Amino acid sequence: MYSNKNDKDKDKDQNNENNKNNDDEAISLKILVVGKLACGKTSIIQRYCHNNFQPKYKPTIGVDFQQKVLEIMGQKVLLQLWDIAGQERFGHMTRVYFQNAHGAVIVFDATRSGTFLGAKAWKDDIDYCFNNENLPTILLANKCDLLTPPYTFPEDINTFCEQNRFNKYFYTSAKEDTGINEALEELVKIILESYQTQEQSTGFKLSDQSQSTETTPTQSKTCC
């Protein structure tokens, strides 16, 4: 009986150690979610992280963030989605939250052409803050449930993405839960693949950078 108890204790300790190792293997990815006012950024995050939709609009003040754990390409990922306010008066303040980001989502309202043009300004801002290092970035045409295909925008969206170095674009609807999971999972894949390539060529590991990603405000050295 005594030896059986010891065996159970050993098994329990081993299970705890395995769980700890699994937690240690998870990496954190900080994703910026930006775009002009009332494009549905918060609704996209709420739909993705909590699978709910609030039709009543409430603007984000400054910055907020939500988290979701997922597994992609055999890698456990803690995804941190940073909801950046779209109001111009918060522009200078919110840029300090760009530091240590691994990727970005730029959102525009498919029913408002001005927000499509505003997406370029956000991409230019990100490129400037990251010294034109081409941070993995996707473009979301949100509220597509309010339009009838084929969708038309001030510029051809394929050409627009190529010229402004977006990795991909997606048609999304937070209300109808369309395209959001696919978009964010694809962005994570792009990030993981890019760092796998970097790791092979330089020995750099994504986890090295992830450890420096914080959930508290830190002042950016490259963008203000």
UniProtKB/Swiss-Prot annotation:
Keywords: GTP-binding, Lipoprotein, Nucleotide-binding, Prenylation
GO cellular-component term (any): endomembrane system
GO molecular function list: GTP binding; GTPase activity
Residues noted as binding GTP in the record, renumbered to the chain: 35-42, 83-87, 142-145
Biased composition (Low complexity): 209-224
NCBIfam families in alphabetical order: small_GTP
Family statement: Belongs to the small GTPase superfamily. Rab family.
Protein name in the entry: Ras-related protein Rab-32C
Organism in which the protein naturally occurs: Dictyostelium discoideum
